[in-house]
Swiss-Prot record:
To H.diomphalia holotricin 3. Coiled coil: none annotated. The keyword Signal applies. It is found in: Secreted. It comes from Tenebrio molitor (Yellow mealworm beetle). GO terms for cellular component: extracellular region. Residues 19-96 are annotated as: Disordered. Keywords: Antibiotic, Antimicrobial, Fungicide, Immunity, Innate immunity, Repeat, Secreted, Signal. Sequence repeats lie at residues 23-26, 31-34, 35-38, 39-42, 43-46, 47-50, 51-54, 59-62, 63-66, 67-70, 77-80, 86-89. Residues 26-89 have a biased composition (Gly residues). The keyword Secreted applies. This is Tenecin-3. Residues 23-89 are annotated as: 12 X 4 AA repeats of G-X-X-G.
Length: 96
């Protein structure tokens, strides 16, 4: 019974977690604005304006290092505080 309860808690926790694979709004691996590996505006490997983690820690222009060949990053200002943040900050706020 104890094992069942632990499994149930894990399932609920995973279900409640933010979607880091949201496509347009970033996330850890993919997305239009971020992701560690790719994305239009961020990512550690490639991205236009992002930074080390892309859209994950902060929004449209944020990120840790400023991206490779980009102009964003920590110095430019972390525009949005949310996970996989959008243009205005927060989670899932970019719109389209």
């Amino acid at each position: 019974m104890k094992t069942f309860v632990i499994c149930l808690i894990l399932v609920v926790a995973v279900s409640a977690a933010p979607d880091h694979h949201d496509g347009h709004l970033g996330g850890h691996q993919t997305g239009h604005q971020g992701g560690q590996q790719g994305g239009h505006l961020g990512g550690q490997q490639g991205g236009h304006l992002g930074g080390h983690q892309g859209g994950q820690p902060g929004g449209h222009l944020g990120g840790h290092q400023g991206g490779i060949g980009g102009t964003g990053g920590q110095q430019h200002g972390q525009h949005g505080p949310g996970t996989g943040a959008g243009h205005q900050g927060g989670y899932k706020t970019h719109g389209h």
